[in-house]
């Protein structure tokens, strides 16, 4: 009766507090072991989610969830149980100008942002250091990055052409 909001599940994530999060085609679902709570955007301008098609859930070092939808990101703060859709302002504070097409949080809680037509940014929250890896500076091959993941040597950038670039964790090259 109180199951998932959609049978199309795009991502499953367990946060540091033990909640299970299900990114579905019809909202974000949180399971606490007993009940399912569904977050949907009934008004796309004011609701918690920019879009109901939720694609990915990740947790940063401050225990905030970065939620990717078909229309952009929102950040869920578990302390206040509130959503913040102004991701641009948060990134601006870190020195990043642009809206991320992709965000990846690695095992060390470092944050990788892909900004279309610009490149990637590695942000290390612990030291508040920002490393731009930009197309026009020749630091990355130009193209559209469709996924960011991790391997034993570093971080993988997957391009829409099928090209895969591995960035060394220590040198970011």
Label each residue range with its predicted role:
Residues 1-173:
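Carboxylate-rich, polar loop motifs that coordinate divalent cations or form catalytic acidic clusters
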């Amino acid at each position: 009766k109180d199951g998932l909001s959609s049978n199309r599940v795009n991502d499953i994530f367990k946060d540091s507090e033990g909640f299970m999060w299900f990114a579905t085609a019809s909202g974000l679902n949180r399971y606490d072991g007993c009940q399912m709570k569904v977050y949907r955007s009934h008004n796309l301008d004011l609701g918690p989610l920019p879009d109901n098609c939720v694609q990915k859930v990740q947790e940063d070092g401050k225990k905030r969830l970065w939620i990717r939808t078909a229309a952009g990101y929102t950040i869920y703060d578990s302390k206040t149980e509130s959503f913040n859709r102004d991701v641009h302002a948060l990134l601006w504070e870190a020195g990043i100008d642009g809206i991320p097409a992709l965000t990846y949080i690695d095992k060390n809680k470092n944050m990788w942002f892909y900004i279309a037509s610009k490149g990637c940014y590695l942000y290390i929250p612990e030291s508040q250091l920002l490393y731009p890896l930009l197309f026009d500076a020749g630091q990355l091959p130009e193209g559209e990055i469709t996924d960011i993941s991790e391997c034993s040597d570093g971080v993988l950038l997957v391009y829409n052409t099928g090209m895969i670039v591995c960035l060394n964790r220590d040198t970011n090259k």
